[in-house]
């Protein structure tokens, strides 16, 4: 789970 777009 990245903390930006996706």
UniProtKB/Swiss-Prot annotation:
GO CC terms, sorted: extracellular region
Domain of life: Eukaryota
Entry GO MF terms: toxin activity
KW Lipid biosynthesis (keyword) present: no
GO biological process: defense response; vasodilation
Tissue specificity field: Expressed by the skin glands.
Function: Vasodilator. May target bradykinin receptors (BDKRB).
The protein's name: Bradykinin-related peptide Pnor-3
């Amino acid at each position: 789970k990245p903390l930006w777009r996706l």
